């Protein structure tokens, strides 16, 4: 395999794992692009992005433009490196056409869906929310559009009925290096294929989307909860308080025409709520300003019997 000079652009954990794996290959990481440092937490302590941490540990130069309009000098610095290829995954900053044209083989984007399905910011969450049974990793030749570039390689992944956004994210982080290295190996001869099929868009997640609609089926609610785990978290409103849900199971029994959203039972087995077709049992709940707890531990400190028969929403 030919040794390539690579510029890497990414920011969060998934990008950092791919970068770690790329360092283990024979390719040369010339420089890394990542978002600027952020002040986080109560103490407003400045934190580096996960990608920056990996780059510094490997003594690689790091560029952190606020934007390429505000920091055009970064483009010139990258041009001087004369990279063979630029690899992008979850960078989070809009790149201009001038950036896309720098490298000999252009910019490769690692996108975690089977394009053109779920273009955009939240493909993992939207795939689970929609009840998709499969997803994948696409290595895409970046162009000026939103995830519209030609496909160079694909790895299909099954979505399990127990997958959450976190577990699927972790699978993508672990598996993304395989199709990337395959693509780099064949970069001189690989034939880009235009995206086929009807596109769909994975719009950015909002905190308010976590609210559970119990008029939906138990399966749809399962998809909703798993899609929004760990963030923003799925929840229901009880006495004007947002109660986040944790572990749950679907009880395969008829709800005897009890209205969706009705609290059927609360005991040490769980917190049972009727959906449009079945009962869903929550084994863990998180009350405001508290930790996520097993229902057994909650009942040791709270009397919830008064809510049996109560209809949510």
UniProtKB/Swiss-Prot annotation:
<dbReference type="GO" id="GO:0005829">
    <property type="term" value="C:cytosol"/>
</dbReference>
<feature type="binding site">
    <location>
        <begin position="113"/>
        <end position="116"/>
    </location>
    <ligand>
        <name>(6S)-5,6,7,8-tetrahydrofolate</name>
    </ligand>
</feature>
<dbReference type="InterPro" id="IPR037022">
    <property type="entry name" value="Formyl_trans_C_sf"/>
</dbReference>
<keyword id="KW-0648">Protein biosynthesis</keyword>
<dbReference type="InterPro" id="IPR001555">
    <property type="entry name" value="GART_AS"/>
</dbReference>
<dbReference type="InterPro" id="IPR011034">
    <property type="entry name" value="Formyl_transferase-like_C_sf"/>
</dbReference>
<dbReference type="GO" id="GO:0004479">
    <property type="term" value="F:methionyl-tRNA formyltransferase activity"/>
</dbReference>
<dbReference type="InterPro" id="IPR005794">
    <property type="entry name" value="Fmt"/>
</dbReference>
<dbReference type="InterPro" id="IPR002376">
    <property type="entry name" value="Formyl_transf_N"/>
</dbReference>
<dbReference type="InterPro" id="IPR044135">
    <property type="entry name" value="Met-tRNA-FMT_C"/>
</dbReference>
<comment type="similarity">
    <text>Belongs to the Fmt family.</text>
</comment>
<keyword id="KW-0808">Transferase</keyword>
<comment type="function">
    <text>Attaches a formyl group to the free amino group of methionyl-tRNA(fMet). The formyl group appears to play a dual role in the initiator identity of N-formylmethionyl-tRNA by promoting its recognition by IF2 and preventing the misappropriation of this tRNA by the elongation apparatus.</text>
</comment>
<dbReference type="InterPro" id="IPR005793">
    <property type="entry name" value="Formyl_trans_C"/>
</dbReference>
<dbReference type="InterPro" id="IPR036477">
    <property type="entry name" value="Formyl_transf_N_sf"/>
</dbReference>
<protein>
    <recommendedName>
        <fullName>Methionyl-tRNA formyltransferase</fullName>
        <ecNumber>2.1.2.9</ecNumber>
    </recommendedName>
</protein>
<dbReference type="Pfam" id="PF00551">
    <property type="entry name" value="Formyl_trans_N"/>
</dbReference>
<dbReference type="Pfam" id="PF02911">
    <property type="entry name" value="Formyl_trans_C"/>
</dbReference>
<dbReference type="InterPro" id="IPR041711">
    <property type="entry name" value="Met-tRNA-FMT_N"/>
</dbReference>
